[in-house]
Amino acid sequence: MPHFILLTKLTSDGVKTIKNNPDRIAEVNREMEQIGLKVHHQWATLGQYDFISVVEADDAETMAKASVELGSRGTTVNETLNAIPSDDFAGSL
């Protein structure tokens, strides 16, 4: 199954939500799994993005659906990258 890198910035509403309910991070991960994603790794980061997640989805359409769902909530702005294993990439050259 394809892997994706999900780069997340919290909006001001998102910051308030996390501050008032830190468990919301785990809740969102469970919700992403219900949409069809599997969260493999997730880091809170300092800098341009607030969270970086490595997720797996059945296909790009499932990832797109999840991205729209997450973005529609108004608490995050997301950027999604398709992650190709380096061995697969090298083999395709």
PLM features per residue range, with description:
Residues M1-E33, K38, T45-Y49, S86-L93:
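Short S/T/G/P-rich N-terminal loop/turn motif that feeds into the first structured element of a domain
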Residues H41-W43, T80-L81:
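Short beta-strand segments at enzyme active-site cores
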Residues Q34, D59-E61, L81, G91:
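Short alpha-helix boundary/capping motifs
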Residues V68-L93:
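Glycine-rich beta-strand-turn "strand-cap" elements at beta-sheet edges
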Residues I5-K9, W43-A66:
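Short, well-ordered beta-strand segments in beta-rich or mixed alpha/beta enzyme
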Residues V15, S53, E79:
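Short, flexible active-site loop motifs that bind/organize anionic cofactors or intermediates
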Residues L37-V39, T75-T76:
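A short, amphipathic edge element
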